[in-house]
């Protein structure tokens, strides 16, 4: 974290990142605990939505988030899209709750029992995951493993669609989808992905990403930088705060893209489960409104997802700018100091 040259800086309790900045063991513990929180939310919220779900009302016209995503995966609904009971959905929710306890226990184990810094571990492979923020070889090694996990997740999604099947809005049923690995089509969808209208291309994009990420991950793990680590290559810029800022930029950008995609696309976000497409409005900030008449105070699943993603993405981007400026050495305390001194400041003109 940025210290502005103070070697004995003290952070407040709210600066949670400061406690794990140079302690890779605690960093892993925080990751595991965070995963547990996400799994707990997924399981608990699925049960909450299942208790409120009304089969007589279109799913897209109910304030639901988890159930529509399960429905698009063909879980809890038959091939015609009819709700077939909550047994499978309940089982998935409970599995997530159990996993949340496992992840939470893993976080406690890493935090209380294992070394706070992986560099002190007795396991050789574990020591490779020590944190050296200004060492590109160390950072690229860790990045490579992240990319491989993301690639494997893409493979799981593609294979689920190919073997089990997912909801096809055009056919109005669940069907198996073979990915279209046409590189020309994938390349062109970089510019019109918001209007993609067939599942084969969607799966093809995920299959390409799986190959790209796993290959890139292996490359980052196996290779080291060529030549001297100079300022031109980023020496002096690579730091914990800089990497945090880039992470916030990435997740913020993805959230905003997801908002636009959810608002307009009915192939990935079917009308059956998410409701009708939205209209973009402008007030103090951009926002999306429903195009269908609903009871007072009610909104479609699409409206909830779109607006939440957009505003979260907006604030993530603000966090990116904040931490990026700090990483570059900008001291925000000087701003408040300058503002407070405006009334007493004087200007002297030299002859």
Swiss-Prot record:
Transmembrane feature ranges: 27-47, 64-84, 89-109, 202-222, 242-262, 305-325
Cleaved signal peptide residues: none
Induction: This transcript is moderately expressed between 4.5 and 72 umol blue light/m2/s. The whole antenna complex is most highly expressed under low light; as the light levels increase antenna complex levels decrease. Thus at least in this strain the amount of antenna complex is controlled mostly at a post-transcriptional level. Transcription decreases upon iron starvation.
Subcellular location, principal: membrane
Keywords, in A-Z order: Chlorophyll, Chromophore, Membrane, Photosynthesis, Photosystem I, Photosystem II, Thylakoid, Transmembrane, Transmembrane helix
Membrane topology category: Multi-pass membrane protein
Annotated localization: Cellular thylakoid membrane
InterPro entries listed in its UniProt record: PS_antenna-like, PS_II_antenna-like_sf
GO molecular function, one term: chlorophyll binding
Cofactor needs: divinyl chlorophyll a; divinyl chlorophyll b
One GO process term, biological-process aspect: photosynthetic electron transport chain
One cellular component (GO) term of this entry: photosystem II
Extra information: This low-light-adapted strain contains 8 pcb genes.
Assembly and binders: The antenna complex consists of divinyl chlorophylls (a and b) and divinyl chlorophyll a/b binding proteins and binds more divinyl chlorophyll b than does the antenna complex from high-light-adapted Prochlorococcus.
Biological function: The antenna complex functions as a light receptor, it captures and delivers excitation energy to photosystems II and I. The Prochlorales pcb genes are not related to higher plant LHCs.
Family: Belongs to the PsbB/PsbC family. IsiA/Pcb subfamily.
NCBIfam families noted in UniProt: PS_antenn_a_b
Name of the protein this chain belongs to: Divinyl chlorophyll a/b light-harvesting protein PcbA
Species for this entry: Prochlorococcus marinus (strain SARG / CCMP1375 / SS120)
